[in-house]
């Protein structure tokens, strides 16, 4: 699974939290100063890589998640475990419990 950019994660977090939505509805939740095309590009890329999908019958498109938040987090944790702890889950667990 592809690691998302901060902006892509921001969009996904909102859709996971609030459910399916249009690009226009995302803009005020992210940043009113961003142009429609900026958010639209992020959403279309998420659609292209399989994180989002949409219904083609209606305009504006209503985008909904194809990847659950839980699955994405699981993949992130696995990736960190592999990259930094040689897949040793015990070392990983120790690292995140150190205060």
Kindly give the residue locations of the regions a language model identified:
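Glycine-centered, phosphate/nucleic-acid-interacting loop/turn motifs that mediate DNA/RNA or nucleotide
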Residues: 50
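Amphipathic alpha-helical dimerization/coiled-coil segments
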Residues: 75-99
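Short, cationic-aromatic polyanion-contact patches
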Residues: 3-7, 57-77
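Short acidic, hydrophobic short linear motifs in intrinsically disordered regions
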Residues: 20-30
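Short helix-coil-helix linker/hinge
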Residues: 2-7, 20, 86
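Short helix-capping/hinge SLiMs at alpha-helix to coil transitions
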Residues: 2, 15-19, 67
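Short amphipathic alpha-helical interaction segments
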Residues: 33-45
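Pre-recognition alpha-helix immediately N-terminal to the DNA-recognition helix
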Residues: 9-14, 25
